[in-house]
Swiss-Prot record:
Keyword Protease in annotation: no
Organism: Rhizobium etli (strain ATCC 51251 / DSM 11541 / JCM 21823 / NBRC 15573 / CFN 42)
Keywords: Cytoplasm, Hydrolase
A cellular component term, taken from the record's GO annotations: cytoplasm
Subcellular location: Cytoplasm
GO BP term (any one): urea catabolic process
Protein name per the record: Urease subunit gamma
InterPro entries reported for this sequence: Urease_gamma (IPR012010), Urease_gamma/gamma-beta_su (IPR002026), Urease_gamma_sf (IPR036463), Urease_subunit (IPR050069)
Matches recorded under Gene3D superfamilies: Urease, gamma-like subunit (3.30.280.10)
EC number per UniProt: 3.5.1.5
Enzyme class: hydrolase
Any GO MF annotation of the entry: nickel cation binding
Pathway listed: Nitrogen metabolism; urea degradation; CO(2) and NH(3) from urea (urease route): step 1/1
Catalytic activity: urea + 2 H2O + H(+) = hydrogencarbonate + 2 NH4(+)
Length: 100
């Protein structure tokens, strides 16, 4: 299987998001990369489903709460930017203050 660097990045984020979901199910708090992966995966999958950019920007801020991440992680993440493929092309989606 020959994958482009972008496809490899998407798979890596998706796998990290799967790990993050499993940890949340076990009650384990997420670290920085896991939190970023979970939010990014939400945006990428939402774009694939055809959800509008504005909706993903708003909904992306409700994927993870402060009590689901390790201490100090929420303060470290001010914005998450994801290049996602929508039915009408690739767009940059920015989720501001994603952990509230």
């Amino acid at each position: 299987m020959n994958l482009t660097p972008r496809e490899k990045d998407k798979l890596l984020i998706s796998m990290a998001a799967i790990v993050a979901r499993r940890r949340l199910e076990r009650g384990v708090k997420l670290n920085y990369p896991e939190a970023i992966a979970l939010i990014s995966d939400f945006v990428v999958e939402g774009a694939r489903d055809g959800r509008p950019v504005a909706e993903l920007m708003e909904a992306g801020a409700h994927v993870i709460s402060r009590d689901q991440v390790m201490e100090g992680i929420a303060e470290m993440i001010h914005d998450v930017q994801v290049e996602a493929t929508f039915p009408d092309g690739t767009k940059l989606v920015t989720v501001h203050e994603p952990i509230r």
